[in-house]
């Protein structure tokens, strides 16, 4: 039969052997496995050995002793790798021969496969330990006892049920901390074993010209790929006690100490340490839901990765048999000690013994499992590849049909074996038998574990969350992420890699943090909601890092995580705010207590009344000792940032209009200016006393706000343009201090101290950037002037642009008499007669200079502030109206803000109401856009297609008034 499937001439056998019936077992082995054929080609001595005597199960023994003899002569790691690979290939080829010729039971084959793997791993470990001790010294604990590297074999290796071409899942550990002795330089035990483990993985896993020994997977260790490669017993115990999850309990059921020795105290201690984590003393029914979630996760992975023809993960497959057994082990293993067993095949009859399953159910599961494992081993032996997917090519299908038609199987309750025969001769019949097994297993699974069609699976939203929950973990894979993101139409495929980078980087950081079991469980449930919400929107690439940064700052504050998870209104509001403002995202990350206020729509948006900012600031600072200057300044910054956050939230959520936003930002700045002046005054006066001309509680000092501050039009990131004035007589001195100085020097030191407070950079950042260049004579002028000197300068020396700047001024700090004195200077200066032609010319020249230096000069873009038709043009129009008409209409000089200047122009008959309203509309629309761009930390530039109507009207008004 075999020769009709693959002619002997294709097997590259010697010509004199091609027609001999005696070599039929060899033909069978080569037919079943390309790997066997390749191994015989590479190792002709093995072929000669087989032709002299074909392999038998008795030849598959003494791996440890045979390896020890061979490795005793190995001089270096390169040779070590080569010898291990050649040994592995010879022995696997031998086992494939035995399997394909049906010389042993299915169970015996994977027991030998497991023993071979264990021997190879331990041989490599022991050789490397000696080499590392020679290089670094011998690792010892504080008692001087030599430490060893213990290796936990997980999964099928631990259960002694390894596949032909399985990965091996390992966890490395060592008993005690300490240092090496006897080396050139002592190193910590952790470094010694980490270096040794890295070399061991390389020896086993690296693909060389000789192939590999075993693909090695370390992801089952604490914290997965992000965790340390080797842990001490203490670190491992701490992890499993504090952070171990149910899926890790599930995995640990099969954990085996490789080379386990009951006389070894370290081996005994490690087993005793892990047992309470895996097996609870009570009946642990809470594990059922965890197991069901794990199975549903795998089922979703089957769909996501198109694994429907996978005999391991598919419905009724290997994994479901394992789930049934391990469910009972997790629930009852602590009480029923006979369930504390690594081998699935040994556990199954014990489930019947405990009446947890019927005899029929156990036999069904046992027979199905053996059939599946025969399929799996045959598939993997073909090309030495780890696969559980049924083949689509006819040659592999024929191999599978032949191998699974009949085989030896061990009896369920004894050491005896029996011959199993299935009545199929082709692929279709094979699939029918396989389907019968799968249906039988699935029925038992549903009876024990429960139906998978839960509400989560029926609800598309919950199903999406479940998919996210499956993949959002420390070992997130781009392949899995891409599969989930395909369900979000607004996410472009080119974005997948960047999204993966954000998640991967974040999770790698989180794995090292003491988040705790409760916190990690909340994160497991919260992150899917965050991801689902973010990727439903347009701005996911901007929003994802902002929100991850917030969550990053609260990972160890479980209360906040729970708040975000339990209060449904928090997440949508948080995403709405963060999508429109980088600033808000950063502030919430810095001050997580603001999350509390997201619980109600009015919470975060409940801004102060205008007149309450000053008292609110006083209340905020009262908790800080007066002598702690830096803490007070830091408090000022925190108060400012918190209040700006509230204003921004009210802006984004539509609670405040644009004019009110600027009002709030301006009054907030005034409250802070008031606090800064008082703080500076106290410090300067404690040293120098106070100017002698002052009455009690007077300061004789005023702060003049220019620009946006003066015009009550501050933005989120506006500087403060300030000028300082005082009313001290020329020959005045200070009194009551440690040192007397002139009053002018006093006010100069006061101004310097105010500047210092504003500019001090603390952990909360700079309070405000302060610009003093608008003072008389600019940077060449005095830092603080008298009222008289200021008036003289404004009326006799100021340039036209300085008079323009004076339009937008207010006294923002000072006693009432000083405010009145300043306003008198301002209005009288603005009301001076001016030649309208010269005024227009000078304003236009200044505007042209600004345009040349500051505009975008782009046909595709529009700079909202500096380009023609933008905010600066509107401001210049308002300033022109004041300077040109205040002499005739004093009312024009009253207001410092543009909107009320335009209102006054209507009252004075200078503008029509329609012109005023349209200018106000243009101004507020452009300012509103700038506000929102600043929240996103973007420049004040938009596409040239925006605001075309507004820009056209502003240019028209410019031509009408100033051309």
Swiss-Prot record:
One matching Pfam family, short form?
Answer: GlnE
Q: Name one GO cellular component term.
A: cytosol
Reactions this protein catalyses: [glutamine synthetase]-O(4)-(5'-adenylyl)-L-tyrosine + phosphate = [glutamine synthetase]-L-tyrosine + ADP; [glutamine synthetase]-L-tyrosine + ATP = [glutamine synthetase]-O(4)-(5'-adenylyl)-L-tyrosine + diphosphate
Transmembrane regions: none
Q: Where is this region: Adenylyl removase?
A: 1-453
Which keywords appear in this protein's UniProt record, sorted alphabetically?
ATP-binding, Magnesium, Multifunctional enzyme, Nucleotide-binding, Nucleotidyltransferase, Transferase
Recorded GO molecular functions are: [glutamate-ammonia-ligase] adenylyltransferase activity; [glutamine synthetase]-adenylyl-L-tyrosine phosphorylase activity; ATP binding; magnesium ion binding
What is the top EC class of this enzyme, as a single word?
Answer: transferase
Record-level GO BP terms: regulation of glutamine family amino acid metabolic process
Q: Which cofactor does it need?
A: Mg(2+)
Question: Which residue ranges are recorded for the region named Adenylyl transferase?
Answer: 461-963
Its Enzyme Commission number?
A: 2.7.7.89, 2.7.7.42
What does the UniProt function comment say about this protein? Involved in the regulation of glutamine synthetase GlnA, a key enzyme in the process to assimilate ammonia. When cellular nitrogen levels are high, the C-terminal adenylyl transferase (AT) inactivates GlnA by covalent transfer of an adenylyl group from ATP to specific tyrosine residue of GlnA, thus reducing its activity. Conversely, when nitrogen levels are low, the N-terminal adenylyl removase (AR) activates GlnA by removing the adenylyl group by phosphorolysis, increasing its activity.
- Protein family membership: Belongs to the GlnE family.
What this protein is called in its record is Bifunctional glutamine synthetase adenylyltransferase/adenylyl-removing enzyme
